[in-house]
A protein has these predicted regions:
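Noncatalytic, solvent-exposed loop/strand surfaces
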Residues: 1-172
Length: 172
């Protein structure tokens, strides 16, 4: 082991009770895969935490997607893995549009997030609409870079996006 860090529990406090909770015994809130470009490594957790470290184990930045964009609206837990590509960090938040288990808000948007991997700051956010219903809106897939586009599967569709803006190029 070259280094070890405690990035946090991955859980978040229960509403009003001050205790951590887990919604599902099948999910640990640390189901997403870390991603690296050989210079840094980024971990994402089901509670919305994103944490980046350099290759020596020094924390570079930390942020929480739920704090920045509102409570997730997932049946189980958020577990999409981030993608590092061409000097940018991409993360899909493809969620349902109605509260579930008391979490989320009506008409919660699904979106793609592009961040600076060195700082964690948002470069762009692009809403991704779908006509799917309830749990069919949820996806935990990883964004795939392919031929100058970002491929995103979920919400009953496959879409191609411009990596510079997030704008949708095509939909199938």
């Amino acid at each position: 082991t070259l280094w070890e860090q405690n990035a946090g529990s991955g859980y978040r406090p229960g509403k009003g009770d001050g205790f951590d909770y887990q919604l599902d015994s099948k999910a640990t809130y640390a189901n997403a895969s870390p991603v690296t470009d050989g210079n840094l490594v980024v971990f994402s957790y089901g509670n919305g935490d994103l944490v980046a470290y350099d290759m020596g184990g020094k924390e570079l930045w930390r942020r929480n997607i739920q704090k920045d964009y509102g409570d997730f609206c997932f049946q189980w837990t958020f577990s999409a893995s981030a993608t590092l590509h061409a000097g940018k960090l991409y993360l899909p938040i493809l969620q349902r549009n109605e509260p579930v288990h008391g979490r989320g808000k009506p008409n919660a948007p699904s979106f793609l997030l592009c961040m600076n991997p060195q700082t964690g700051k948002t470069i762009w956010q692009h809403q991704r609409h779908s006509n799917a219903n309830k749990e069919s809106l949820e996806s935990f897939g990883t964004i795939i870079p392919h031929k100058g586009q970002l491929l995103v599967a979920g919400g009953d569709v496959l879409t191609g996006h411009d990596p510079a803006t997030g704008n949708e190029i095509w939909r199938w």
